[in-house]
Amino acid sequence: MKLLKDSGAALLALFFVLVYLLPVNSRLLWQPDETRYAEISREMLQRGDWVVPYFMDIRYFEKPVAGYWFNNISQWIFGDSNFAVRFGSIFSTALSAVLVYWLATLLWRNRSTSVLATLIYLSFLLVFGIGTYAVLDPMISLWLTAAMVSFYLTLKAENWQQKVGAYALLGVACGMGFMTKGFLALAVPVIAVLPIVIQQKRIKDLVVFGPIAIVCAVLLSLPWALAIAQREPDFWNYFFWVEHIQRFAEASAQHKSPIWYYLPILCIGVLPWLGLLPGALFKGWRERATKPELFFLLSWVVMPLLFFSVAKGKLPTYILPCMAPLSLLMAAYATDCANNIRMRALKINGVINLLFGVACALVIVVIGLGLVKDIVAYGPQENQKVWLGVLAFAGWGVTGFITLRNNARNWRWAAACPLLFILLVGYLIPQQVVDSKQPQNFIKNNFSELSSSRYVLTDSVGVAAGLAWELKRSDILMFSEKGELTYGLAYPDSQDNYISNDDFPTWLAQARKEGDVSLVVQLAKNEALPAHLPPADKVNLMNRLALLWYQKTP
Protein backbone atom coordinates (compact mmCIF):
# COMPACT_ATOMS: atom_id res chain seq x y z
CA MET A 1 0.00 0.00 0.00
CA LYS A 2 2.88 2.37 0.77
CA LEU A 3 4.25 1.83 -2.75
CA LEU A 4 0.90 2.77 -4.26
CA LYS A 5 0.75 5.88 -2.11
CA ASP A 6 4.31 7.06 -2.76
CA SER A 7 4.72 6.11 -6.42
CA GLY A 8 1.15 5.60 -7.59
CA ALA A 9 1.20 8.15 -10.41
CA ALA A 10 4.48 6.79 -11.79
CA LEU A 11 3.24 3.19 -11.64
CA LEU A 12 0.00 4.10 -13.39
CA ALA A 13 1.88 6.00 -16.09
CA LEU A 14 4.25 3.07 -16.64
CA PHE A 15 1.36 0.60 -16.79
CA PHE A 16 -0.54 2.81 -19.24
CA VAL A 17 2.46 3.21 -21.54
CA LEU A 18 3.20 -0.54 -21.55
CA VAL A 19 -0.39 -1.63 -22.08
CA TYR A 20 -2.10 1.14 -24.02
CA LEU A 21 0.61 2.88 -26.05
CA LEU A 22 3.61 0.71 -26.93
CA PRO A 23 1.96 -2.32 -28.59
CA VAL A 24 -0.93 -0.75 -30.53
CA ASN A 25 0.79 0.41 -33.71
CA SER A 26 2.25 -3.04 -34.43
CA ARG A 27 -1.17 -4.74 -34.37
CA LEU A 28 -3.02 -4.96 -37.66
CA LEU A 29 -6.46 -3.38 -37.91
CA TRP A 30 -9.47 -5.67 -37.54
CA GLN A 31 -12.36 -5.67 -39.96
CA PRO A 32 -15.12 -4.64 -39.97
CA ASP A 33 -14.95 -2.24 -37.00
CA GLU A 34 -11.47 -0.76 -37.04
CA THR A 35 -11.21 -0.50 -40.82
CA ARG A 36 -14.65 1.16 -40.90
CA TYR A 37 -13.88 3.87 -38.37
CA ALA A 38 -10.43 4.46 -39.83
CA GLU A 39 -11.90 5.06 -43.28
CA ILE A 40 -14.84 7.22 -42.17
CA SER A 41 -12.49 9.65 -40.44
CA ARG A 42 -10.04 9.61 -43.35
CA GLU A 43 -12.86 10.60 -45.69
CA MET A 44 -14.08 13.30 -43.28
CA LEU A 45 -10.63 14.84 -43.27
CA GLN A 46 -10.29 14.49 -47.03
CA ARG A 47 -13.68 16.11 -47.67
CA GLY A 48 -13.33 18.72 -44.95
CA ASP A 49 -16.89 17.83 -43.95
CA TRP A 50 -17.34 17.22 -40.22
CA VAL A 51 -21.15 17.20 -40.31
CA VAL A 52 -22.30 14.32 -42.53
CA PRO A 53 -20.48 10.96 -42.21
CA TYR A 54 -19.64 9.22 -45.48
CA PHE A 55 -18.23 5.73 -45.83
CA MET A 56 -16.63 4.95 -49.20
CA ASP A 57 -18.54 7.89 -50.71
CA ILE A 58 -21.82 6.48 -49.36
CA ARG A 59 -23.97 8.13 -46.68
CA TYR A 60 -23.46 6.36 -43.36
CA PHE A 61 -26.03 7.21 -40.70
CA GLU A 62 -25.43 4.53 -38.05
CA LYS A 63 -23.85 6.95 -35.53
CA PRO A 64 -23.67 10.70 -34.82
CA VAL A 65 -20.39 12.53 -35.35
CA ALA A 66 -18.66 13.27 -32.02
CA GLY A 67 -16.90 9.91 -31.92
CA TYR A 68 -15.66 10.46 -35.45
CA TRP A 69 -14.34 13.87 -34.37
CA PHE A 70 -12.07 12.16 -31.83
CA ASN A 71 -10.73 9.92 -34.59
CA ASN A 72 -10.45 12.81 -37.06
CA ILE A 73 -8.26 14.77 -34.66
CA SER A 74 -6.14 11.67 -33.98
CA GLN A 75 -5.49 11.12 -37.69
CA TRP A 76 -4.89 14.84 -38.22
CA ILE A 77 -2.19 14.82 -35.51
CA PHE A 78 -0.62 11.36 -35.95
CA GLY A 79 -1.20 10.66 -39.64
CA ASP A 80 -2.48 7.43 -41.17
CA SER A 81 -0.89 4.90 -38.81
CA ASN A 82 -2.64 2.15 -36.85
CA PHE A 83 -1.74 4.11 -33.72
CA ALA A 84 -3.64 7.13 -35.06
CA VAL A 85 -6.69 4.99 -35.80
CA ARG A 86 -6.77 3.69 -32.23
CA PHE A 87 -5.67 6.82 -30.38
CA GLY A 88 -9.21 8.17 -30.04
CA SER A 89 -10.16 5.08 -28.04
CA ILE A 90 -6.93 5.17 -26.03
CA PHE A 91 -7.31 8.87 -25.21
CA SER A 92 -10.93 8.34 -24.14
CA THR A 93 -9.88 5.46 -21.89
CA ALA A 94 -7.15 7.62 -20.34
CA LEU A 95 -9.67 10.38 -19.57
CA SER A 96 -12.06 7.81 -18.09
CA ALA A 97 -9.21 6.60 -15.84
CA VAL A 98 -8.60 10.19 -14.71
CA LEU A 99 -12.30 10.50 -13.83
CA VAL A 100 -12.13 7.22 -11.88
CA TYR A 101 -9.19 8.60 -9.90
CA TRP A 102 -10.98 11.90 -9.27
CA LEU A 103 -14.23 10.27 -8.14
CA ALA A 104 -12.32 7.90 -5.84
CA THR A 105 -10.62 10.93 -4.29
CA LEU A 106 -13.97 12.66 -3.81
CA LEU A 107 -15.44 9.53 -2.23
CA TRP A 108 -12.68 8.48 0.16
CA ARG A 109 -9.91 11.12 0.28
CA ASN A 110 -7.37 8.31 0.16
CA ARG A 111 -4.66 8.43 -2.49
CA SER A 112 -3.86 4.72 -2.27
CA THR A 113 -7.49 3.75 -2.88
CA SER A 114 -7.70 6.21 -5.78
CA VAL A 115 -4.60 4.73 -7.40
CA LEU A 116 -5.89 1.20 -6.81
CA ALA A 117 -9.27 1.96 -8.38
CA THR A 118 -7.57 3.43 -11.45
CA LEU A 119 -5.19 0.48 -11.72
CA ILE A 120 -8.07 -1.98 -11.47
CA TYR A 121 -9.95 -0.08 -14.16
CA LEU A 122 -7.03 0.05 -16.60
CA SER A 123 -6.18 -3.64 -16.06
CA PHE A 124 -9.71 -4.96 -16.66
CA LEU A 125 -9.55 -7.25 -19.69
CA LEU A 126 -12.67 -5.65 -21.15
CA VAL A 127 -11.34 -2.10 -20.70
CA PHE A 128 -8.01 -2.99 -22.29
CA GLY A 129 -9.62 -4.94 -25.13
CA ILE A 130 -12.04 -2.17 -26.10
CA GLY A 131 -9.85 0.72 -24.98
CA THR A 132 -7.18 -0.15 -27.57
CA TYR A 133 -9.70 -1.04 -30.29
CA ALA A 134 -10.96 1.57 -32.75
CA VAL A 135 -14.66 1.67 -31.93
CA LEU A 136 -16.89 4.38 -30.44
CA ASP A 137 -17.61 2.60 -27.16
CA PRO A 138 -14.62 4.09 -25.27
CA MET A 139 -15.93 7.55 -26.19
CA ILE A 140 -19.47 6.88 -24.96
CA SER A 141 -18.01 5.24 -21.86
CA LEU A 142 -16.02 8.42 -21.22
CA TRP A 143 -19.12 10.61 -21.37
CA LEU A 144 -21.17 8.25 -19.20
CA THR A 145 -18.35 8.16 -16.64
CA ALA A 146 -18.32 11.96 -16.75
CA ALA A 147 -22.09 11.90 -16.22
CA MET A 148 -21.62 9.66 -13.16
CA VAL A 149 -19.03 12.02 -11.66
CA SER A 150 -21.20 15.05 -12.45
CA PHE A 151 -24.21 13.48 -10.78
CA TYR A 152 -22.15 12.76 -7.69
CA LEU A 153 -21.26 16.46 -7.61
CA THR A 154 -24.99 17.28 -7.65
CA LEU A 155 -25.46 15.14 -4.55
CA LYS A 156 -22.62 16.84 -2.70
CA ALA A 157 -23.47 20.40 -3.76
CA GLU A 158 -23.97 22.64 -0.72
CA ASN A 159 -25.90 25.50 -2.34
CA TRP A 160 -28.02 26.17 -5.38
CA GLN A 161 -25.13 27.67 -7.37
CA GLN A 162 -23.13 24.46 -7.00
CA LYS A 163 -26.18 22.39 -7.94
CA VAL A 164 -26.75 24.45 -11.08
CA GLY A 165 -23.09 24.02 -12.06
CA ALA A 166 -23.12 20.27 -11.40
CA TYR A 167 -26.33 19.72 -13.36
CA ALA A 168 -24.91 21.82 -16.20
CA LEU A 169 -21.85 19.53 -16.28
CA LEU A 170 -24.20 16.54 -16.30
CA GLY A 171 -25.98 18.04 -19.30
CA VAL A 172 -22.71 18.61 -21.15
CA ALA A 173 -21.65 15.00 -20.52
CA CYS A 174 -25.01 13.66 -21.72
CA GLY A 175 -24.98 15.99 -24.72
CA MET A 176 -21.55 14.80 -25.82
CA GLY A 177 -22.63 11.21 -25.22
CA PHE A 178 -25.70 11.79 -27.37
CA MET A 179 -23.52 13.18 -30.16
CA THR A 180 -21.29 10.12 -29.87
CA LYS A 181 -23.80 7.27 -29.83
CA GLY A 182 -27.28 8.71 -29.69
CA PHE A 183 -30.16 8.41 -27.24
CA LEU A 184 -28.39 5.68 -25.27
CA ALA A 185 -26.38 8.42 -23.54
CA LEU A 186 -29.62 9.95 -22.26
CA ALA A 187 -31.31 6.72 -21.19
CA VAL A 188 -28.45 5.17 -19.20
CA PRO A 189 -27.90 8.08 -16.74
CA VAL A 190 -31.64 8.33 -16.06
CA ILE A 191 -31.88 4.61 -15.33
CA ALA A 192 -28.74 4.66 -13.18
CA VAL A 193 -29.74 7.60 -10.95
CA LEU A 194 -33.34 6.59 -10.21
CA PRO A 195 -32.52 4.17 -7.34
CA ILE A 196 -30.08 6.75 -5.92
CA VAL A 197 -32.53 9.66 -5.83
CA ILE A 198 -35.18 7.39 -4.33
CA GLN A 199 -32.82 6.08 -1.63
CA GLN A 200 -31.46 9.53 -0.76
CA LYS A 201 -34.84 11.27 -1.14
CA ARG A 202 -33.53 13.62 -3.83
CA ILE A 203 -36.48 13.40 -6.22
CA LYS A 204 -37.34 17.08 -5.65
CA ASP A 205 -33.80 18.14 -6.56
CA LEU A 206 -33.95 16.03 -9.72
CA VAL A 207 -37.27 17.59 -10.74
CA VAL A 208 -36.12 21.16 -9.98
CA PHE A 209 -32.58 21.05 -11.34
CA GLY A 210 -32.82 18.21 -13.86
CA PRO A 211 -34.17 20.51 -16.61
CA ILE A 212 -30.86 22.41 -16.45
CA ALA A 213 -29.08 19.26 -17.60
CA ILE A 214 -31.63 18.76 -20.37
CA VAL A 215 -31.27 22.35 -21.60
CA CYS A 216 -27.46 22.12 -21.61
CA ALA A 217 -27.53 18.82 -23.50
CA VAL A 218 -29.94 20.26 -26.08
CA LEU A 219 -27.97 23.49 -26.53
CA LEU A 220 -24.75 21.53 -27.02
CA SER A 221 -26.11 19.10 -29.61
CA LEU A 222 -28.60 21.39 -31.37
CA PRO A 223 -26.22 23.07 -33.87
CA TRP A 224 -25.07 19.77 -35.34
CA ALA A 225 -28.56 18.22 -35.10
CA LEU A 226 -30.02 21.09 -37.14
CA ALA A 227 -27.11 21.12 -39.59
CA ILE A 228 -27.42 17.44 -40.48
CA ALA A 229 -31.22 17.65 -40.60
CA GLN A 230 -30.90 20.46 -43.14
CA ARG A 231 -28.39 18.62 -45.31
CA GLU A 232 -29.76 15.08 -44.87
CA PRO A 233 -33.47 15.26 -43.93
CA ASP A 234 -33.80 11.47 -43.50
CA PHE A 235 -30.94 11.13 -40.98
CA TRP A 236 -33.03 11.38 -37.81
CA ASN A 237 -35.75 9.07 -39.13
CA TYR A 238 -33.20 6.35 -39.92
CA PHE A 239 -31.08 6.91 -36.83
CA PHE A 240 -34.00 6.82 -34.39
CA TRP A 241 -36.10 3.99 -35.81
CA VAL A 242 -33.46 1.67 -37.25
CA GLU A 243 -30.44 2.29 -35.03
CA HIS A 244 -32.38 2.54 -31.75
CA ILE A 245 -35.83 0.97 -31.85
CA GLN A 246 -34.96 -1.99 -34.09
CA ARG A 247 -31.54 -2.60 -32.54
CA PHE A 248 -32.73 -2.55 -28.92
CA ALA A 249 -36.37 -3.56 -28.86
CA GLU A 250 -37.69 -5.31 -31.95
CA ALA A 251 -37.57 -9.03 -32.66
CA SER A 252 -35.50 -8.28 -35.76
CA ALA A 253 -32.78 -6.57 -33.71
CA GLN A 254 -29.15 -7.00 -34.72
CA HIS A 255 -26.91 -9.20 -32.55
CA LYS A 256 -29.78 -10.92 -30.73
CA SER A 257 -28.67 -12.80 -27.61
CA PRO A 258 -30.32 -14.26 -24.47
CA ILE A 259 -30.89 -12.16 -21.37
CA TRP A 260 -27.98 -13.84 -19.51
CA TYR A 261 -25.52 -12.98 -22.30
CA TYR A 262 -23.59 -10.42 -20.25
CA LEU A 263 -22.92 -12.66 -17.24
CA PRO A 264 -20.02 -14.59 -18.82
CA ILE A 265 -18.87 -11.42 -20.61
CA LEU A 266 -18.73 -9.62 -17.26
CA CYS A 267 -16.81 -12.45 -15.59
CA ILE A 268 -14.21 -12.56 -18.35
CA GLY A 269 -14.13 -8.79 -18.69
CA VAL A 270 -13.22 -8.11 -15.05
CA LEU A 271 -10.20 -10.44 -15.12
CA PRO A 272 -7.69 -10.31 -13.45
CA TRP A 273 -10.00 -9.17 -10.61
CA LEU A 274 -12.82 -11.72 -10.90
CA GLY A 275 -12.36 -12.95 -7.33
CA LEU A 276 -13.45 -9.53 -6.03
CA LEU A 277 -16.63 -9.30 -8.10
CA PRO A 278 -19.19 -11.05 -5.81
CA GLY A 279 -17.90 -9.42 -2.63
CA ALA A 280 -17.77 -5.94 -4.16
CA LEU A 281 -21.35 -6.13 -5.41
CA PHE A 282 -22.59 -7.61 -2.15
CA LYS A 283 -20.77 -4.93 -0.14
CA GLY A 284 -22.43 -2.20 -2.19
CA TRP A 285 -25.86 -3.62 -1.33
CA ARG A 286 -25.20 -4.67 2.27
CA GLU A 287 -23.80 -1.28 3.28
CA ARG A 288 -26.21 0.83 1.27
CA ALA A 289 -27.54 2.57 4.37
CA THR A 290 -24.27 3.23 6.22
CA LYS A 291 -22.17 3.97 3.10
CA PRO A 292 -24.47 5.51 0.49
CA GLU A 293 -21.51 6.13 -1.84
CA LEU A 294 -21.24 2.36 -2.34
CA PHE A 295 -24.90 2.12 -3.29
CA PHE A 296 -24.32 5.04 -5.66
CA LEU A 297 -21.62 3.01 -7.44
CA LEU A 298 -23.69 -0.18 -7.32
CA SER A 299 -26.58 1.55 -9.05
CA TRP A 300 -24.30 2.76 -11.86
CA VAL A 301 -23.12 -0.84 -12.34
CA VAL A 302 -26.33 -2.82 -12.00
CA MET A 303 -28.96 -0.58 -13.62
CA PRO A 304 -27.14 -0.14 -16.97
CA LEU A 305 -26.26 -3.85 -16.92
CA LEU A 306 -29.94 -4.74 -16.50
CA PHE A 307 -30.91 -2.29 -19.23
CA PHE A 308 -28.47 -3.79 -21.72
CA SER A 309 -29.48 -7.33 -20.70
CA VAL A 310 -33.17 -6.64 -21.37
CA ALA A 311 -32.42 -5.09 -24.78
CA LYS A 312 -32.74 -7.49 -27.71
CA GLY A 313 -29.47 -6.53 -29.42
CA LYS A 314 -26.28 -7.20 -27.46
CA LEU A 315 -22.55 -6.82 -28.00
CA PRO A 316 -19.72 -7.21 -25.44
CA THR A 317 -18.73 -3.56 -25.91
CA TYR A 318 -22.07 -2.25 -24.64
CA ILE A 319 -21.27 -2.87 -20.95
CA LEU A 320 -18.00 -0.93 -20.99
CA PRO A 321 -19.62 1.99 -19.07
CA CYS A 322 -20.25 -0.39 -16.15
CA MET A 323 -16.51 -0.91 -15.64
CA ALA A 324 -15.67 2.49 -14.11
CA PRO A 325 -18.09 2.27 -11.16
CA LEU A 326 -17.25 -1.42 -10.76
CA SER A 327 -13.53 -0.65 -10.43
CA LEU A 328 -14.36 1.79 -7.63
CA LEU A 329 -16.51 -0.77 -5.85
CA MET A 330 -13.75 -3.37 -6.14
CA ALA A 331 -11.13 -0.95 -4.84
CA ALA A 332 -13.27 -0.18 -1.79
CA TYR A 333 -13.90 -3.87 -1.16
CA ALA A 334 -10.26 -4.93 -1.63
CA THR A 335 -8.99 -2.13 0.61
CA ASP A 336 -11.47 -3.11 3.30
CA CYS A 337 -10.40 -6.77 3.06
CA ALA A 338 -6.70 -5.92 3.28
CA ASN A 339 -7.11 -3.43 6.14
CA ASN A 340 -9.08 -5.94 8.20
CA ILE A 341 -6.85 -8.88 7.20
CA ARG A 342 -9.77 -10.69 5.60
CA MET A 343 -7.70 -12.17 2.80
CA ARG A 344 -10.02 -14.90 1.55
CA ALA A 345 -11.37 -13.00 -1.47
CA LEU A 346 -7.88 -11.78 -2.37
CA LYS A 347 -6.57 -15.36 -2.21
CA ILE A 348 -9.48 -16.60 -4.31
CA ASN A 349 -8.62 -13.94 -6.87
CA GLY A 350 -5.04 -15.23 -6.98
CA VAL A 351 -6.23 -18.82 -7.41
CA ILE A 352 -8.51 -17.78 -10.27
CA ASN A 353 -5.63 -16.07 -12.07
CA LEU A 354 -3.35 -19.05 -11.48
CA LEU A 355 -5.90 -21.53 -12.81
CA PHE A 356 -6.90 -19.28 -15.71
CA GLY A 357 -3.30 -18.87 -16.84
CA VAL A 358 -2.51 -22.58 -16.58
CA ALA A 359 -5.76 -23.60 -18.29
CA CYS A 360 -5.27 -21.21 -21.22
CA ALA A 361 -1.64 -22.29 -21.65
CA LEU A 362 -2.73 -25.94 -21.78
CA VAL A 363 -5.52 -25.18 -24.26
CA ILE A 364 -3.05 -23.44 -26.58
CA VAL A 365 -0.66 -26.39 -26.37
CA VAL A 366 -3.40 -28.92 -27.10
CA ILE A 367 -4.89 -26.95 -30.00
CA GLY A 368 -1.61 -25.57 -31.30
CA LEU A 369 0.01 -29.00 -31.57
CA GLY A 370 -3.02 -30.40 -33.38
CA LEU A 371 -4.04 -32.80 -30.61
CA VAL A 372 -7.72 -32.04 -31.27
CA LYS A 373 -8.39 -33.14 -34.83
CA ASP A 374 -11.56 -31.11 -35.34
CA ILE A 375 -9.94 -27.82 -34.30
CA VAL A 376 -7.13 -26.49 -36.46
CA ALA A 377 -6.06 -23.03 -35.32
CA TYR A 378 -2.37 -22.85 -36.19
CA GLY A 379 -0.58 -24.06 -39.29
CA PRO A 380 2.57 -26.26 -39.31
CA GLN A 381 4.81 -23.17 -39.64
CA GLU A 382 3.28 -21.36 -36.66
CA ASN A 383 4.84 -23.21 -33.73
CA GLN A 384 6.49 -19.98 -32.60
CA LYS A 385 3.05 -18.43 -32.11
CA VAL A 386 1.98 -21.44 -30.07
CA TRP A 387 4.89 -21.15 -27.68
CA LEU A 388 4.51 -17.38 -27.41
CA GLY A 389 0.89 -18.01 -26.41
CA VAL A 390 2.00 -20.53 -23.81
CA LEU A 391 4.52 -18.01 -22.48
CA ALA A 392 1.89 -15.26 -22.29
CA PHE A 393 -0.56 -17.33 -20.26
CA ALA A 394 2.15 -18.99 -18.19
CA GLY A 395 3.13 -15.46 -17.16
CA TRP A 396 -0.49 -14.85 -16.17
CA GLY A 397 -0.51 -17.98 -14.03
CA VAL A 398 2.89 -17.33 -12.44
CA THR A 399 1.85 -13.80 -11.48
CA GLY A 400 -1.35 -15.20 -10.02
CA PHE A 401 0.77 -17.57 -7.93
CA ILE A 402 2.95 -14.67 -6.73
CA THR A 403 -0.15 -12.86 -5.47
CA LEU A 404 -0.97 -15.87 -3.28
CA ARG A 405 2.34 -15.97 -1.41
CA ASN A 406 2.80 -14.66 2.14
CA ASN A 407 -0.91 -14.65 2.89
CA ALA A 408 -1.70 -12.78 -0.36
CA ARG A 409 0.47 -9.87 0.71
CA ASN A 410 1.19 -9.03 -2.94
CA TRP A 411 -2.44 -9.20 -4.08
CA ARG A 412 -2.20 -5.89 -5.97
CA TRP A 413 0.19 -7.54 -8.43
CA ALA A 414 -2.87 -9.15 -9.99
CA ALA A 415 -2.90 -6.11 -12.27
CA ALA A 416 0.29 -7.46 -13.88
CA CYS A 417 -1.23 -10.87 -14.70
CA PRO A 418 -2.27 -10.00 -18.26
CA LEU A 419 0.85 -7.93 -19.01
CA LEU A 420 2.71 -10.53 -21.10
CA PHE A 421 -0.49 -11.47 -22.91
CA ILE A 422 -1.18 -7.82 -23.75
CA LEU A 423 2.34 -7.26 -25.07
CA LEU A 424 2.35 -10.45 -27.15
CA VAL A 425 -1.26 -10.77 -28.31
CA GLY A 426 -0.56 -9.20 -31.71
CA TYR A 427 1.94 -11.98 -32.42
CA LEU A 428 -0.32 -14.86 -31.29
CA ILE A 429 -3.10 -14.57 -33.84
CA PRO A 430 -3.31 -17.58 -36.20
CA GLN A 431 -2.46 -16.76 -39.80
CA GLN A 432 -5.85 -17.96 -41.01
CA VAL A 433 -7.47 -15.34 -38.76
CA VAL A 434 -5.03 -12.65 -39.92
CA ASP A 435 -5.84 -13.37 -43.55
CA SER A 436 -9.61 -13.21 -43.04
CA LYS A 437 -10.06 -10.61 -40.28
CA GLN A 438 -7.03 -8.34 -40.70
CA PRO A 439 -6.99 -7.41 -44.39
CA GLN A 440 -3.96 -5.08 -44.18
CA ASN A 441 -1.66 -8.08 -44.54
CA PHE A 442 -3.47 -9.28 -47.68
CA ILE A 443 -3.61 -5.80 -49.19
CA LYS A 444 0.11 -5.18 -48.71
CA ASN A 445 0.95 -8.51 -50.34
CA ASN A 446 -1.17 -7.55 -53.37
CA PHE A 447 -0.55 -3.82 -53.33
CA SER A 448 0.87 -3.60 -56.85
CA GLU A 449 -2.21 -5.07 -58.54
CA LEU A 450 -4.67 -3.22 -56.29
CA SER A 451 -3.06 0.20 -56.53
CA SER A 452 -2.81 0.06 -60.33
CA SER A 453 -6.45 -0.96 -60.82
CA ARG A 454 -8.97 1.50 -62.22
CA TYR A 455 -11.74 -0.28 -60.32
CA VAL A 456 -11.57 -2.22 -57.05
CA LEU A 457 -14.54 -4.30 -55.84
CA THR A 458 -15.18 -6.60 -52.89
CA ASP A 459 -18.05 -8.55 -51.38
CA SER A 460 -17.20 -7.61 -47.76
CA VAL A 461 -17.82 -4.18 -46.23
CA GLY A 462 -15.02 -4.67 -43.70
CA VAL A 463 -12.54 -5.65 -46.41
CA ALA A 464 -13.76 -2.73 -48.54
CA ALA A 465 -12.97 -0.36 -45.68
CA GLY A 466 -9.50 -1.88 -45.36
CA LEU A 467 -8.92 -1.46 -49.09
CA ALA A 468 -10.08 2.16 -48.99
CA TRP A 469 -7.88 2.91 -45.97
CA GLU A 470 -4.72 1.30 -47.35
CA LEU A 471 -5.14 2.51 -50.94
CA LYS A 472 -6.29 5.99 -49.82
CA ARG A 473 -9.25 5.95 -52.19
CA SER A 474 -12.93 6.06 -51.31
CA ASP A 475 -14.30 4.69 -54.59
CA ILE A 476 -14.22 1.00 -53.61
CA LEU A 477 -17.28 -0.73 -55.10
CA MET A 478 -19.45 -3.32 -53.40
CA PHE A 479 -19.93 -6.59 -55.26
CA SER A 480 -22.81 -9.00 -54.62
CA GLU A 481 -23.27 -8.03 -50.94
CA LYS A 482 -24.41 -4.68 -49.51
CA GLY A 483 -24.26 -5.43 -45.77
CA GLU A 484 -24.44 -2.37 -43.53
CA LEU A 485 -24.31 -0.10 -46.60
CA THR A 486 -27.76 -1.20 -47.78
CA TYR A 487 -29.45 2.02 -46.66
CA GLY A 488 -26.81 4.35 -48.12
CA LEU A 489 -26.69 2.45 -51.42
CA ALA A 490 -30.42 3.06 -51.88
CA TYR A 491 -29.79 6.74 -52.60
CA PRO A 492 -29.87 7.45 -56.37
CA ASP A 493 -26.40 9.02 -56.37
CA SER A 494 -24.87 5.92 -54.72
CA GLN A 495 -26.46 3.09 -56.67
CA ASP A 496 -23.50 2.86 -59.05
CA ASN A 497 -21.32 1.89 -56.06
CA TYR A 498 -22.89 -1.59 -56.10
CA ILE A 499 -22.48 -4.30 -58.76
CA SER A 500 -24.71 -7.36 -58.51
CA ASN A 501 -23.67 -10.91 -59.35
CA ASP A 502 -25.87 -10.93 -62.44
CA ASP A 503 -24.60 -7.59 -63.72
CA PHE A 504 -20.92 -8.29 -63.07
CA PRO A 505 -19.91 -9.97 -66.39
CA THR A 506 -21.42 -7.16 -68.47
CA TRP A 507 -20.07 -4.47 -66.18
CA LEU A 508 -16.60 -6.08 -66.18
CA ALA A 509 -16.39 -6.18 -69.96
CA GLN A 510 -17.00 -2.44 -70.10
CA ALA A 511 -14.83 -1.58 -67.08
CA ARG A 512 -11.77 -3.40 -68.48
CA LYS A 513 -11.74 -0.98 -71.40
CA GLU A 514 -10.97 1.80 -68.90
CA GLY A 515 -8.27 -0.01 -66.93
CA ASP A 516 -7.38 -2.98 -64.73
CA VAL A 517 -10.05 -4.36 -62.39
CA SER A 518 -9.42 -6.01 -59.00
CA LEU A 519 -12.08 -8.12 -57.30
CA VAL A 520 -11.44 -9.21 -53.70
CA VAL A 521 -13.76 -11.94 -52.43
CA GLN A 522 -14.03 -13.31 -48.91
CA LEU A 523 -14.57 -17.05 -48.88
CA ALA A 524 -16.09 -19.34 -46.28
CA LYS A 525 -13.72 -21.82 -44.66
CA ASN A 526 -12.50 -24.36 -47.26
CA GLU A 527 -14.69 -22.73 -49.92
CA ALA A 528 -13.45 -22.71 -53.51
CA LEU A 529 -13.64 -19.67 -55.76
CA PRO A 530 -17.16 -19.18 -57.14
CA ALA A 531 -17.39 -20.91 -60.51
CA HIS A 532 -19.71 -18.27 -61.99
CA LEU A 533 -17.04 -15.54 -61.89
CA PRO A 534 -15.36 -14.71 -65.21
CA PRO A 535 -11.84 -16.17 -65.48
CA ALA A 536 -9.22 -13.75 -64.16
CA ASP A 537 -5.79 -13.00 -65.59
CA LYS A 538 -4.29 -13.51 -62.14
CA VAL A 539 -5.60 -15.10 -58.94
CA ASN A 540 -3.91 -14.65 -55.56
CA LEU A 541 -5.41 -16.73 -52.74
CA MET A 542 -4.53 -16.28 -49.06
CA ASN A 543 -6.68 -18.53 -46.88
CA ARG A 544 -10.15 -16.94 -46.99
CA LEU A 545 -9.31 -13.88 -49.09
CA ALA A 546 -8.81 -14.06 -52.84
CA LEU A 547 -7.81 -11.43 -55.40
CA LEU A 548 -9.07 -11.84 -58.94
CA TRP A 549 -7.18 -9.42 -61.17
CA TYR A 550 -8.52 -8.58 -64.60
CA GLN A 551 -6.11 -6.83 -66.96
CA LYS A 552 -7.19 -3.92 -69.13
CA THR A 553 -8.44 -4.94 -72.56
CA PRO A 554 -7.81 -3.03 -75.79
UniProtKB/Swiss-Prot annotation:
Signal sequence range: none
Subcellular location: Cell inner membrane
Any GO BP: protein O-linked glycosylation
Membrane topology term: Multi-pass membrane protein
Pathway per the UniProt entry: Lipopolysaccharide metabolism; 4-amino-4-deoxy-beta-L-arabinose-lipid A biosynthesis
Family: Belongs to the glycosyltransferase 83 family.
Function: Catalyzes the transfer of the L-Ara4N moiety of the glycolipid undecaprenyl phosphate-alpha-L-Ara4N to lipid A. The modified arabinose is attached to lipid A and is required for resistance to polymyxin and cationic antimicrobial peptides.
NCBIfam families: PRK13279.1 (NF009784)
Name this protein carries in UniProt: Undecaprenyl phosphate-alpha-4-amino-4-deoxy-L-arabinose arabinosyl transferase
Organism, scientific name: Yersinia pseudotuberculosis serotype I (strain IP32953)
Gene: arnT
